[in-house]
């Protein structure tokens, strides 16, 4: 079955689009990437999305218009990826997250992904599955992360313990015990580790007065020295101490949050590069701390994906904090494209929904039950 996966994450870089061929059975899928492309948002739309993610208020009418505009660009991405390929039979669209509230006490969580599937299906004339997180949240789960089940099927190893570490705007991990271990699927864990690129990107935009949107390959940060005392202070953030299941987003790690980190740094007389190096170290240490604090064992291998996988300085700092016994790779090195891994994941989640196969792992999200994820629009 030919399926398109569409994904735009918390970095709001653009629409990651993957055309994949899925064969085999739902419980033993074979996935081949036929084409992958990231289509940038139009500048005005990206700016509006970032403003909304930052807490800017919209009228209901403006929100509806934003939803339609995002859906139109997602639909165009799906049409573009097929121009030199066979027509897809199904689309799985994550949409654009603009708000995420984890569950608390007796209150269900809440999440908003814009770019409605009904509009994508109408424009493309291809059945579209979207709103993947809602069913898990209705079962008292976080609705995130949803990728661990895909990681289990595509990236687990017979004898090695692995972690898959996505470093997008937010970092999230999947812990994969060896497949030969008894009841290994019940022992899979996953959660959001904290900031991935989000604070680094916001800082680069601030320091460059909007001329740069990210630290290319970590070159700016690599010119500085992280301030250990300052990073230790930042690590007192309660989220880092919270036990899984847990999820987070730009609602916490926001421009206002970065402004506080900037204020904290004033007492240390840091250069711009030192501050960026410290923010990069915060991401690296928060990931390593998550592993060392919450995992039953350290992995033999960590497989990186997402934009942060291309940041050489971040990789260097992460390896330093994880320790020499951990091998750091990208998912490319084990056969899964790291740039389009999330888009591939939502193609497979759509395929599972189409075939009535549950897509969540309750022990990961905190949901009461495994459920079908996504709503089908024809």
Swiss-Prot record:
Disulfide-bonded cysteines: none
Reactions catalysed, as given in the entry: 1,6-anhydro-N-acetyl-beta-muramate + ATP + H2O = N-acetyl-D-muramate 6-phosphate + ADP + H(+)
Amino acids binding ATP: 9-16
One family name in Pfam for this protein: AnmK
InterPro entries linked to this entry: Anhydro_N_Ac-Mur_kinase (IPR005338), ATPase_NBD (IPR043129)
Alphabetical list of CDD domains matching this protein: ASKHA_NBD_ANMK
UniProt keyword terms in alphabetical order: ATP-binding, Carbohydrate metabolism, Kinase, Nucleotide-binding, Transferase
Pathway(s) of this molecule: Amino-sugar metabolism; 1,6-anhydro-N-acetylmuramate degradation; Cell wall biogenesis; peptidoglycan recycling
A single GO BP: 1,6-anhydro-N-acetyl-beta-muramic acid catabolic process
EC number: 2.7.1.170
One GO MF term attached to the UniProt entry: ATP binding
Gene3D superfamilies for this protein: 3.30.420.40
Glycoprotein as UniProt keyword: no
Function: Catalyzes the specific phosphorylation of 1,6-anhydro-N-acetylmuramic acid (anhMurNAc) with the simultaneous cleavage of the 1,6-anhydro ring, generating MurNAc-6-P. Is required for the utilization of anhMurNAc either imported from the medium or derived from its own cell wall murein, and thus plays a role in cell wall recycling.
Family: Belongs to the anhydro-N-acetylmuramic acid kinase family.
Full protein name: Anhydro-N-acetylmuramic acid kinase
Gene behind the chain: anmK
